[in-house]
Amino acid sequence: MSIVPVVKQMITLSLLMLTGFFANRFGILGRDAQKWMSKLIINITCPALILSSVTTSQRLENNQMVLIIFGAAIAYYLILPFLAKGCALAGPRNRRSEYTCMLIYSNLGFMGIPVANAVLGKEAILYISIFMAIFNISIFSYGIILLGGTGGGKLQFKKMINPGTVSAVAAVLLYLGSISIPTLLLEPITAMGNTTTPLAMMVIGASLANGKVRDLFTEKSMILFTVLRLLGLPLLAWGVCQILGVQDRLLAGALILISGMPVASNTVMLCTELNRDGDYIAKGLLISTLASVVTIPLISMLL
């Protein structure tokens, strides 16, 4: 894939993030506004984007491919924890759970879907949606155990049923059943979904303004983590696709992009819910988000 269109898309996304950054600095998009905008994106606009994109995208050659994507997603979230635990050994002993969590869970909703839509086209959103469904099951089961310690975290099955998971499953069912959404409903759903990318990028930019950016890159272990998160994992995913001979361009592209996304914002929310200090993960989220502006065009060259 040519890097030029990817760079153009990342410049667009960066300008949107910059808008959010300055909106925060000028008191327009403060912490409270970021919270309600995040809820709006997670609960309304992102599910709308998933539904509209999947139902209007070009169909795959056969439905068997959907099962293959599900299998790939399940394998991804079963194997990655073992790799992440091994990589986390390079970090501080008291932060290994956080490192493991940050390496496993990437930002699929806020950045994965918008970037995949921009880089691979809306056909790729079906792939990301399936990964999102497995992601939600994983983070609200293993993620809670990981951050909650040996006895502090309990599985929260209700948390697995959320707008992101429901819309992802609904989109797959609509796709498999060749069911079309009536135009009267599809047009407003599409309009809402189209706001996801600008809103999400602005919220991410605003969150970057909450801390001191200059202090983020002073910790060596965090820099190592950022390299692993944004370059090491996507290179590994690319290598696995080459070894296994993955022919489907969108599946390989989705795997590589998902592996190279910054830390998921859900991890910080989990820390808050489990009464665990989330500042360290928030730091990893900010660093990886900033660095991804440069690394995403680089890994896109592998697609």
Language-model features and meaning:
Residues 1-303:
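Alpha-helical transmembrane segments of multi-pass small-molecule/ion transporters
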